[in-house]
């Protein structure tokens, strides 16, 4: 796990944020079903062509435990939540990375009908697919299955998968979000957001109970994109493994590192929750996507104003040149 930052400045406390509750685990994941409101799947030839070109099949219904192998030979699985998404309109996507675990029953990614389904509903409300990705890590010893160990391999796998998925499903590449919890949040801030963004040209990042940065340089391409960190007030040292690691410390350190690197559309929120295992992920996702949309709107208007000012200035310069 990444080292805890040495300095932990105090963040503003959220006064009315209730303590989040853990969603109950489902005993068995249901088979994938198609919503009556979901448009019919693409014609077979179109879907097959998309799959052949990208290595990922176009998906219009909920699917679980699909496999993908990267060009480097790294293989893992993912889920797709597509119900409630209107494919006649621009479609975005949220890729989700869970925290560390030793047994499958310790991770949300092995319970597709539990909290993941609730998070998918939050994404669908913004017309976005929800895609939890399982770490390629096969080592269940030491730190367990993680995203932050062997990040170069995991990063190559995910960037390849994301590019293929976005192409196969016609996703708007300017509306691609990542969300990570604990070690999954560390993967975003240490790996994905410090490397070239060849797989997307817009979107945002959500880090829950993690997301530090004490080495590496944030990508300049993301400076205007939303980055939102969240930590429970009591999620400090002793809450998780290793005992010396503090999720809240990682949140504060990562937020400060990215802000100092020029990321102006960033925020860090301390929730009135308990410890490391008490987060309302669907609420955090819903709030973050809404906040990201709200903070992005003024920037578009500002750019339009800048273009108007530039045209006016160019016109004045032309008139001056003609006068001279």
Give short role names for the model-derived ranges:
Residues 3-93, 253-266, 291, 297-299, ...:
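A domain-start/cap signature at the N-terminus of enzymes
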Residues 79, 93-97, 129-134, 175-180, ...:
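Structural recognition of the beta-strand scaffold that forms the well-ordered cores
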Residues 85, 143-183:
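Gly/Ser-rich "nucleophile elbow"/oxyanion-hole loop immediately N-terminal to the catalytic nucleophile
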Residues 91-93, 97-159:
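Active-site machinery of serine-nucleophile hydrolases
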Residues 111-121, 193, 209-222, 249-253:
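Alpha-helical scaffolding within the catalytic cores
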Residues 167-170, 174-222:
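Primarily recognizes the serine-hydrolase "nucleophile elbow" in alpha/beta-hydrolase
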Residues 228-239, 252-324:
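C-terminal catalytic histidine-bearing segment of alpha/beta-hydrolase fold enzymes
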């Amino acid at each position: 796990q990444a080292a805890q930052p040495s300095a932990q400045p105090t963040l503003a406390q959220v006064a009315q944020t209730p303590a989040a509750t853990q969603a109950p685990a489902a005993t068995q994941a249901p088979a994938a079903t198609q919503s009556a409101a979901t448009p019919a799947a693409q014609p077979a030839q179109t879907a097959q062509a998309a799959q052949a070109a990208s290595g990922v099949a176009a998906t219009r219904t909920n699917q679980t435990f699909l496999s993908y192998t990267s060009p480097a030979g790294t293989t893992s699985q993912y889920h797709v939540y597509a119900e409630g998404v209107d494919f006649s309109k621009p479609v975005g996507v949220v890729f989700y990375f869970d925290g560390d675990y030793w047994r499958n029953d310790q991770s949300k990614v092995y319970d597709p009908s539990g909290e993941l389904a609730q998070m998918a509903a939050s994404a669908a409300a913004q017309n976005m697919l929800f895609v939890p990705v399982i770490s390629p890590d096969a080592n269940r010893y030491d730190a367990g299955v993680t995203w932050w160990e062997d990040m170069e391999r995991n990063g190559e796998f995910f960037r390849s998968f994301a590019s293929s998925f976005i192409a196969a499903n016609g996703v708007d590449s300017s509306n691609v979000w990542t969300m990570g919890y604990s070690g999954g949040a560390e993967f975003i801030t240490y790996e994905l957001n410090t490397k070239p963004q060849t797989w997307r040209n817009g979107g945002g990042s959500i880090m829950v109970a993690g997301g530090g940065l004490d080495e590496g340089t944030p990508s300049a391409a993301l400076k205007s994109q939303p980055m939102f960190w969240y930590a429970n007030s009591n999620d400090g040292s002793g809450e998780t493994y290793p005992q010396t690691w503090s999720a809240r410390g990682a949140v504060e350190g990562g937020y400060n590192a990215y802000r100092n690197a020029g990321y102006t559309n960033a925020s860090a929120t301390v929730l009135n929750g308990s410890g490391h295992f008490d987060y309302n992920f669907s609420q955090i996702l819903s709030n973050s996507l809404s906040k990201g949309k709200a903070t992005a709107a003024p920037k578009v208007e500002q750019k339009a104003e800048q273009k108007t000012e530039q045209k006016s200035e160019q016109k004045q310069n032309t008139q001056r040149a003609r006068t001279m």
